[in-house]
Amino acid sequence: MVLFNVSRVETTPFGDQKPGTSGLRKKVKVFKQPNYLQNFVQSTFNALTPQNVRGATLVVSGDGRYFSKDAIQIITKMAAGNGLRRVWVGQNGLLSTPAVSAVIRERVGVDGSKATGAFILTASHNPGGPNEDFGIKYNMENGGPAPEGITDKIYENTKTIKEYLTADLPDVDITTIGVTSFSGSEGQFDVEVFDSASDYIKLMKSIFDFESIRKLLSSPKFTFCYDALHGVAGAYAKRIFVEELGAQESSLLNCVPKEDFGGGHPDPNLTYAKELVARMGLGKSNSEVEPPEFGAAADGDADRNMVLGKRFFVTPSDSVAIIAANAVEAIPYFSAGLKGVARSMPTSAALDVVAKSLNLKFFEVPTGWKFFGNLMDAGLCSVCGEESFGTGSDHIREKDGIWAVLAWLSILAYKNRENLGGGKLVTVEDIVHNHWATYGRHYYTRYDYENVDAGAAKELMACLVKLQSSLTEVNEIVSGIQSDVSKVVHADEFEYKDPVDGSISKHQGIRYLFEDGSRLVFRLSGTGSEGATIRLYIEQYEKDPSKTGRDSQDALAPLVAVALGLXKMQEFTGRSAPTVIT
């Protein structure tokens, strides 16, 4: 057994290590600065209770992006230096973010141990590579992201750090499954490399009826396509969709994980998932080949999802509402009923209507999955989602892209249980249109203005807040831009009081609410690594079934004009068009 010694290394603080909603994300060159990663990791260990460090078990893995392998070795040595008992690593350093959550909650090590937390190495949907983004976040013993109380402590520690602890271990082989043991002054330290997918697959099989999905996928009527965008979802896609569920291997796109995501942007939306969008018949040029019935994509760390039907896009806001409306019938895990449902504030109110109709508890929370986690830990929420392509349930404490795809396949299997032999297939588009006929439609779009000058973005938001003090003035501006829209009846900055722990989150987005249920929401996003991103959300509710079939951009055009005029978007940003429209 290799012996190791622990050393204390002097360091000085960096001023830019404040974690955002999903940890710390920066360019790779920033993380490669001497002691940059080490400072953040030590500041995290120092923010945790002693029982979550000394003698504890830590998971360290991620989406496989560039610099992950180096980071795993650095963190493993620091874990030994800080007195942890063992580190668990997914084979090749790969674990999806939802799989990390599942591993913390479900996995038992070869020696009977349980994990108390994890460092997840991901910048989610941001690009990867030597000149692109890297990220790190800490998840707690419930499998969810560190709450603000912990991330605030981490940030305070980064401002005063003077030293970090590390051990002189050799690099560990993370390509081969097995346990490597070392001996230090406080006893044994183990690094266990384990299969990245098996724990997660076992959990999925306990939630869904794999046999009914297998029947659907084996039907000649039903065709399927899944695009991992060269992210970590590829490590799960073949095992689940091909080996477990019998899909054709040719139905998988870009399912080999790559450090730079194949040079692409691993963000599952209509702009970046070009190959899937074209295959599903939604591209600018129509393919002569008949598109598949169902398509889906994942982001870099596989916690986000995009769901498509043949020539049909399902908005994430509709997706979570449709899953909630069908969960009890179609998914065995929910057969006893839903405890409640929740959505992030910018997400459309489609879920609210389902909750009201089904008499379910309903919660509207700020953006950030940790808010859902609190509700789930208290037994108040079963299904939740956000407009940024995140959907999930209380099976783990992260959003889960593959779970969402399996949920949709379960609903399709249930709706088609009688007609796989004969009769017309119930399609994704049919399911969505039937949902609108029952609950009404929330026309919805999101405009993203990426890498905007941070000063200009803050000024724009400040003007919108100031404007809220006079609804009369707001309505004069609105009617001057577009005379045929409803009037604004309420305007505020969204604030959330957590019903579980009483904590208050302020400044969570600027809202303008209209008399007819329409909404405009403006947010500054904290997930980019450079500049600011302004997100503008536009929503209009239509209850009349004869009016739910319009093109959403056409239906929303008057409100879009109001939003851009109210915010003086071009004046502040210099942009005549958004970077991305969803």
From Swiss-Prot:
Its cofactor is Mg(2+). It comes from the Eukaryota. Its EC number is 5.4.2.2. The modification Phosphoserine is found at S124. It catalyses: alpha-D-glucose 1-phosphate = alpha-D-glucose 6-phosphate; O-phospho-L-seryl-[protein] + alpha-D-glucose 1-phosphate = alpha-D-glucose 1,6-bisphosphate + L-seryl-[protein]; alpha-D-glucose 1,6-bisphosphate + L-seryl-[protein] = O-phospho-L-seryl-[protein] + alpha-D-glucose 6-phosphate. Monomer. This is Phosphoglucomutase, cytoplasmic. The gene is PGM1.
